[in-house]
Amino acid sequence: TLPDVLIKLERAGYETSAYATEREGDATLEAERALEQNYDIIIAAGGDGTLNEVVNGIAEQPNRPKLGIIPMGTVNDFGRALHLPNDIMGAVDVIIKGHTTKVDIGKMNNRYFINLAAGGKLTQVSYETPSRLKSIVGPFAYYIKGFEMLPQMKAVDLRIEYDNEAVSYTHLTLPTKA
């Protein structure tokens, strides 16, 4: 629980404050506020969407604080990629021990990302998958919603610029994970 997390962090010497998000954009605004108050670390406790919002709140700052992650979402793709414990207190232990990993930050259409960049219907699937369905069937909910939206999907034109080079594609992708 949140009180247990805060107590554990405080016993380890951290001064803590917590903020519960209620709507899209809240985590970005709170991360920006934490920057103004010169926090040494900002901890994103939530799923990949919450993490993305926090990244967007701190990405443009030259002196970013450390970013702690407590994976609490449906998929926790980025946390899994970093081999973070999937239990809350295990993730808190990683933060307390000071384990850090440098990661690249990408930017697409004025939004930042650290895990993956998606566009077109893929992002729509993520946003339109009902929370209730995710709580019932977990990550499989995204596949259900994706197959439901498949007839509406069309190929997308994509241009990628990297190190002053550009590549253009037209794709319709159905993402799968082994």
Description of each model-found segment:
Residues 3, 11-12, 21, 60-169:
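Catalytic core of DAGKc-family lipid kinases
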Residues 27-28, 51-52, 122:
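Short, well-ordered alpha-helical microsegments
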Residues 45-47, 72:
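Glycine-rich beta-strand-to-loop/alpha-helix junction loops that act as flexible
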Residues 49-51, 76, 120, 178:
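Glycine-rich nucleotide phosphate-binding loop and flanking beta-alpha elements
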Residues 170-178:
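Conserved small/polar residues in nucleotide/adenosyl-binding loops
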